[in-house]
């Protein structure tokens, strides 16, 4: 038996297929989902989701949201998602370096918070291609 996984963003369905295993970046840490998992509703953090399908692992960067698990169906609603295979490692590394400077140069509390969120996104993108 497998898991039916749907990843939905405001503008498109990013993934709608079966998987054998799923690892989610929940707000309390990494969360592993296998078949016949107990029903669950959880908040998702910025991070990397990994799913195993056909014996291979596929990575996606998720930009916060929610996941519902029920009867081997996982619905993920998130603000944004990007498949790891579509991310260029050198571009992701350059973006991380640029955002790190923005965090250091942030003058106001608002700028610091915004730059820190962008830093978390950049780290997740780089982690997805690693």
Curated annotation (Swiss-Prot):
Predominant cellular place of this UniProt entry's protein: plastid
UniProt cross-references to HAMAP family, sorted A to Z: ATP_synth_epsil_bac
The organism's taxonomic lineage, starting at the top: Eukaryota, Haptista, Haptophyta, Prymnesiophyceae, Isochrysidales
Alphabetized Gene3D superfamilies for the sequence: F0F1 ATP synthase delta/epsilon subunit, N-terminal, Helix hairpin bin
Organism: Emiliania huxleyi (Coccolithophore)
SUPFAM superfamilies with a match to the protein in the record: Epsilon subunit of F1F0-ATP synthase N-terminal domain (SSF51344)
Entry GO MF terms: ATP binding; proton-transporting ATP synthase activity, rotational mechanism
Protein name as it appears in the record: ATP synthase epsilon chain, chloroplastic
GO cellular component entries: chloroplast thylakoid membrane; proton-transporting ATP synthase complex
Stored InterPro entries: ATP_synth_F1_dsu/esu (IPR001469), ATP_synth_F1_dsu/esu_N (IPR020546), ATPsynth_dsu/esu_N (IPR036771)
Keywords: ATP synthesis, CF(1), Chloroplast, Hydrogen ion transport, Ion transport, Membrane, Plastid, Thylakoid, Transport
């Amino acid at each position: 038996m497998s898991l039916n996984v749907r990843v939905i963003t405001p503008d498109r369905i990013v993934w709608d297929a079966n998987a054998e295993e799923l690892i989610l970046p929940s707000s309390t840490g990494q969360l592993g989902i296998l078949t016949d998992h107990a029903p669950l509703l959880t908040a998702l953090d910025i991070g990397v989701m990994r799913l195993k399908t056909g014996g291979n692992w596929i990575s996606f960067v998720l930009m916060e949201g929610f996941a519902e698990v029920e009867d081997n169906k996982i619905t993920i609603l998130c603000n944004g998602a990007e498949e790891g295979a579509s991310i260029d490692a050198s571009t992701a590394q350059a973006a991380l370096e640029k955002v790190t400077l923005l965090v250091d140069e942030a003058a106001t509390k608002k700028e610091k918070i915004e730059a820190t969120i962008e830093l978390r996104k950049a780290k997740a993108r780089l982690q997805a291609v690693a």
